[in-house]
UniProtKB/Swiss-Prot annotation:
It comes from Chlorobium phaeovibrioides (strain DSM 265 / 1930) (Prosthecochloris vibrioformis (strain DSM 265)). This is Chaperone protein DnaK. GO terms for molecular function: ATP binding; ATP-dependent protein folding chaperone; unfolded protein binding. The gene is dnaK. Keywords: ATP-binding, Chaperone, Nucleotide-binding, Phosphoprotein, Stress response. The modification Phosphothreonine is found at T196. Gene3D superfamilies: 1.20.1270.10, 3.30.420.40, Actin, Chain A, domain 4, Substrate Binding Domain Of DNAk, Chain A, domain 1.
Length: 635
């Protein structure tokens, strides 16, 4: 059995980690970064880009670059009015579900998420040197049942068996407390990421991580702060020039990148200049956007967002029944906790400095890896007791929601309650399963409905229908209803409201595998073309340097093989390029042998490769790419 990796599938960035012995390790991706942008792009020539490659081309390809897909996962089309309004890509209604439309094809949010998960899976496989099939994936603590199930589906599509869905603040607490198993602490984990906000109160001691309460807002995160800056810039430019940049997808994408950059800069500076030359043009000529944004102004335009942070904190502390003065540490998680105003709010609310000892971008993935180690048996003496974030119940007479399991109940858990019929001679009942905190059924989220039939006719109130709720360790719900008189039972596993069928998931898995093969083939083609290009370059260079030293009777064969390889490189297949390389190498090696009889000379095969190139394992020459990074840019 291989390793169980831990994946933080974030709104803005994703991260993967794995246990190496007793220590968790965050894995660098192929670009050398420890986090990967949660972005997927489809290019005009049909290529699919994931991560940094997708982010790099977003400005020139905004309508085909998908970001913040996590905000659509497990949600109906009519549940995401604000999200679809600000997305530059098309979000369409397909049978009530929110789907992304790229060209003529629609993708479910689970499919797009699976593409990001595949990238994380490949990153782990490259690091470990073995296949990875199992993972622990994190979700916001305040994700509902539908969103959790949809995340599991995304894992399946990516070719992963999701061993556990774990709440992000709980994962962070695991990472924070792993080396503190002998001490006892009460900890608040404050997790403000790219798209969601969670606050959890936990008690840590003797290897037990017990969640006392959790609360949050799945519509509050770094994206929302970015949007405030985007709107501010667009409004200011409209005042100055009379042009609304929000109507231009490319200009809007430039505003988005500038807004995110400005937000980051204002964490360490009190003001920043946003300078976007040639943002648009009129008959009078090009227009440039130059606006100065101060930290005070940023805090002013985001005042309503900062205010929204405190309410979940108040509820979480109240529901935990832990006095504020007994909370030992406030651990900051998520990139948005770097905002100075957020840190000040946390300090004012809890009355103490927040703990910044963990890396806010990586700690959740580290915790997921630790949970993977627990499941594998590699990490011992750790017990995780999580809670369900929202109350669960059914609709009863009068449209009332009757709760069976209250919010912040430790999971896994099971609860049964007996109900009866509402009418005389009623032979069937509908069980309408709900999640939420409101009194009326219509104000809560519907998780599913099912019917229990063949109830013997009887006066109302006489039949006894036992309804059982069972929440597993992933926080996913199973419901059953049983007629106690006949023993007849009906059960349902509550799936996501945007549930994909098994057939759809299998098809998506096959598509994902096919894309993985395509990506592998494309990389092989690029590698061999690069090798051929390097061989052509070094051969021409040697021909120029050696000149008349090359025997005249050998020159036609070299020139012929060189031209043949050039033609194959331009128009040929992988096979013809490989054949051309072998032929040129063979001809050159014969010439090199003659030359070496006279005096040693460098050559493409036998001598030193030109500077900036390196020999491949097969003897071919690869280009070595270098990137110069300014010291200020390297963070």
């Amino acid at each position: 059995m291989g390793k169980i990796i831990g994946i933080d599938l974030g709104t803005t960035n994703s991260c993967v980690a794995v246990m190496q012995g007793t220590q968790p390790t965050v894995i660098e991706n192929s670009e050398g970064n420890r986090t990967t942008p949660s972005m997927v792009a489809f290019t005009k020539n049909g290529d699919r880009l994931v991560g940094q490659a997708a982010k790099r081309q977003a400005i020139t390809n905004p309508t085909n670059t998908i970001f913040s897909i996590k905000r659509f996962v497990g949600r109906k089309f009519d549940e995401v009015p604000n999200e679809k309004k600000i997305a530059p890509y098309a979000v369409v209604n397909e049978g009530g579900e929110a789907r992304v439309k790229i060209n003529d094809k629609t993708y479910s949010p689970q499919e797009i998420s699976a593409m990001i998960l595949q990238k994380m899976k490949q990153t782990a496989e490259d690091f470990l040197g073995e296949k990875v099939t199992e993972a622990v994936i994190t979700v916001p603590a305040y994700f509902n049942d539908a969103q959790r199930q949809a995340t599991k589906d995304a894992g399946r599509i990516a070719g992963l068996e999701v061993k556990r869905i774990i709440n992000e603040p709980t994962a962070a607490a695991l990472a924070y407390g792993l080396d503190k198993k002998t001490s006892s602490e009460k900890v608040a984990v404050f997790d403000l990421g790219g798209g969601t906000f969670d606050i959890s109160i936990l008690e840590l001691g003797d290897g037990v991580f017990e969640v006392k309460s959790t609360d949050g807002d799945t519509h509050l995160g770094g994206d929302d702060f970015d949007q405030k800056i985007i709107d501010f810039l667009a409004d200011e430019f409209k005042k100055q020039e009379g042009i609304d940049l929000r109507n231009d997808p490319i200009a809007l994408q430039r505003l988005k990148e500038a807004g995110e950059k400005a937000k980051i800069e204002l964490s360490s500076r009190t003001d920043t200049e946003i300078n976007l030359p040639f943002i648009t043009a009129t008959q009078e000529g090009p227009k440039h956007l130059v606006i100065n944004l101060t930290r005070a102004k940023f805090e002013g335009i985001c005042a309503d967002l900062f205010a929204k942070i405190l309410e979940p904190c108040q509820r979480a502390v109240k529901n935990s029944k832990v006095p504020m003065k007994e909370i030992d540490e406030i651990v900051l998680v998520g990139g948005s906790t770097r905002i100075p105003k957020v840190q000040a709010l946390v300090k004012d609310f809890f009355g103490k400095e927040p703990n910044k000892s963990v890396n806010p971008d990586e700690v959740v993935a580290v915790g997921a890896a630790i949970q993977g180690g627990v499941l594998k048996g590699d990490v011992t003496d750790v017990l995780l007791l999580d809670v369900t974030p929202l109350s669960l119940g059914i609709e009863t007479l009068g449209g009332v929601m009757t709760k069976l399991i209250d919010a912040n109940t430790t999971i896994p858990t099971k609860k049964q309650e007996v109900f009866s019929t509402a009418g005389d001679n009623q032979t069937s009942v509908e069980v309408h399963v709900l999640q939420g905190e409101r009194s009326m059924a219509t104000d809560n989220k519907t998780l599913g409905r099912f019917h229990l039939g063949d109830i013997p006719p009887a006066p109302r109130g006489l039949p006894q229908i036992e309804v059982a709720f069972d929440i597993d360790s992933n926080g996913i719900l199973h419901v059953s209803a049983k007629d106690k008189a006949t023993g007849k039972e009906q059960s349902i596993k509550i799936e996501a409201s945007s549930k994909l069928t098994d057939a759809e998931i299998e098809k998506m898995k096959e598509d994902a595998k096919a894309h993985a093969e395509e990506d592998k083939k494309l990389k092989e083609e690029i590698d061999i073309k690069n090798s051929a290009d390097a061989l052509i370059f070094s051969t021409e260079k040697q021909l120029e340097e050696l000149g008349d030293k090359i025997p005249a009777d050998k020159r036609p064969a070299i020139d012929g093989a060189l031209e043949k390889l050039k033609d194959a490189h331009k128009n040929g297949t992988t096979e013809t390029i490989q054949s051309g390389m072998e032929e040129l190498s063979k001809v050159w090696s014969e010439v090199a042998a003659d030359l070496y009889k006279e005096e040693p000379q460098g050559n493409p095969e036998g001598g030193s490769a030109p500077e900036g190139e390196k020999k491949g394992d097969d003897g071919s020459v690869e280009n070595a790419e270098y990137e110069v990074i300014d010291g200020d840019d390297k963070k």
